[in-house]
Amino acid sequence: MQWETVIGLEIHAQLATQSKIFSGSSTAFGAAPNTQASLVDLAMPGTLPVLNEEAVRMACLFGLAIDARIDRQNVFARKNYFYPDLPKGYQTSQMDHPIVGKGHLDITLEDGTTKRIGITRAHLEEDAGKSLHEDFQGMSGIDLNRAGTPLLEIVSEPDIRSAKEAVAYVKAIHALVRYLGICDGNMAEGSLRCDCNVSVRPKGQAEFGTRAEIKNVNSFRFIEKAINHEIQRQIELIEDGGKVVQETRLYDPNKDETRSMRGKEEANDYRYFPCPDLLPVVIEPEYLAKLREQLPELPVQKRERFESQYGLSAYDASVLSASREMADYFEKVQGICGDAKLAANWVMVELGSLLNKDGLEIEQSPVSAEQLGGMILRIKDNTISGKLAKMVFEAMANGEGSADQIIEAKGLKQVTDSGAIEKMLDEVLAANAEQVEQYRAADEAKRGKMFGFFVGQAMKASKGKANPQQVNELLKKKLEA
């Protein structure tokens, strides 16, 4: 039997506000436990929440960016459940009247095609605290620094059909919230977490299968692996005569498996009711109109502009627009050197390799956009060859100065004097007279391979400084003379 996978994702984006959603406590990451928890966060009797307007603004920005309906009046609700790191015994969230209604996001698949994923809703809520197990023998500690941190929960329609599509969607959301400046997207610190709802059904069947929810997956790689494992688990279970149970599961990256955590709750299990401590939030059309003017160029728009303005391929434009910082860096380099394709190649290949090796983000690059743009200018004006440029790039990454300073200090200036190159080539050919005779006696197919030998000898003799194009042209003339 052929199976179809159905996936819906719930992404929790931690909003980049300076203070919590209902209190004035700081949201800075990494503070000592319980140093950023106010009386409101501790749920002390008599304290009342005050809504953070910045969180509302950020949620509305997101809604505008996904072309969603934004409710003029939205209501906060209490989601009732007990957990040690939830001091109030309920979480303030939104249920029937979320701030952001139906919208959509287009994702680019591996084959270059575009797919539209529906977004059911996005609502504001507060995060819970954190249970700490490692440092307490036989006990658990509670850190309430995170309690009350504003979250935007983004719920997709069940439109996703594979683990790779799921990753593409999460990457698109990740890029979008970073472009908007509403979330730093740091998955390692928990700023962006994903719950994956996975089910399978026989191909052609309209009715959904029973879903399992994989909680709190925090990397693109783990999302793909967790979903693939869960798909396989469900198919094997059904084919062996079993039934999929609606439940919450956890992904264990060390064992590459999901395991049951608890039975999956439904909305009525949480006994939602409107929060009596918070008034409904009214969002006027004039407010949204002003916000719309603040929207930056979004990832899809930037990618399309890179293709049309700079003539980049769809793939290159997609990579370079993946983050706002990467796009800004590329445009600075291009603005200096005036060659978009050369700039794209150096940013994606050489710089990308350096950043990946050292685990750095583009904003932490040891080579500035000004330095890289200046170096590419020296390639264009034939001061250095592409091969020598790699040496210059490495030196810039090591903090040895600008391209011009390094070229001068290391004597890397390319030899472009035709007379000097001809003299050097004569010496190379004289030293390899036997190979010259073999070349002249060979057919075209063999000559192609042998020509590379002479080029290599010439570049070796010039210590890589001879202009490769001139070497090729002059060498061909001499060998065929």
From Swiss-Prot:
Q: What is its EC number?
A: 6.3.5.-
Q: Which residues form a coiled coil?
A: none
Which keywords fit this entry according to its UniProt record? Answer: ATP-binding, Ligase, Nucleotide-binding, Protein biosynthesis
Looking up Pfam families in the UniProt record yields:
GatB_N, GatB_Yqey
Q: Name one GO biological process term.
A: glutaminyl-tRNAGln biosynthesis via transamidation
Q: Which reaction does it catalyse?
A: L-glutamyl-tRNA(Gln) + L-glutamine + ATP + H2O = L-glutaminyl-tRNA(Gln) + L-glutamate + ADP + phosphate + H(+); L-aspartyl-tRNA(Asn) + L-glutamine + ATP + H2O = L-asparaginyl-tRNA(Asn) + L-glutamate + ADP + phosphate + 2 H(+)
InterPro entries the UniProt entry points to:
Asn/Gln-tRNA_amidoTrfase_suB/E, Asn/Gln-tRNA_Trfase_suB/E_cat, Asn/Gln_amidotransferase, Asn/Gln_tRNA_amidoTrase-B-like, GatB, GatB_C_1, GatB_Yqey_C_2, Gln-tRNA_amidoTrfase_suB_CS
Q: Which GO terms describe its molecular function?
A: asparaginyl-tRNA synthase (glutamine-hydrolyzing) activity; ATP binding; glutaminyl-tRNA synthase (glutamine-hydrolyzing) activity
Iron as a keyword of this entry, yes or no, is: no
The reply to whether rRNA-binding figures as a keyword in the UniProt entry is no
Q: How does it assemble?
A: Heterotrimer of A, B and C subunits.
Q: Which family does it belong to?
A: Belongs to the GatB/GatE family. GatB subfamily.
Quote the function comment for this protein: Allows the formation of correctly charged Asn-tRNA(Asn) or Gln-tRNA(Gln) through the transamidation of misacylated Asp-tRNA(Asn) or Glu-tRNA(Gln) in organisms which lack either or both of asparaginyl-tRNA or glutaminyl-tRNA synthetases. The reaction takes place in the presence of glutamine and ATP through an activated phospho-Asp-tRNA(Asn) or phospho-Glu-tRNA(Gln).
Q: What is this protein called?
A: Aspartyl/glutamyl-tRNA(Asn/Gln) amidotransferase subunit B
Q: Which organism is it from?
A: Pseudomonas aeruginosa (strain ATCC 15692 / DSM 22644 / CIP 104116 / JCM 14847 / LMG 12228 / 1C / PRS 101 / PAO1)
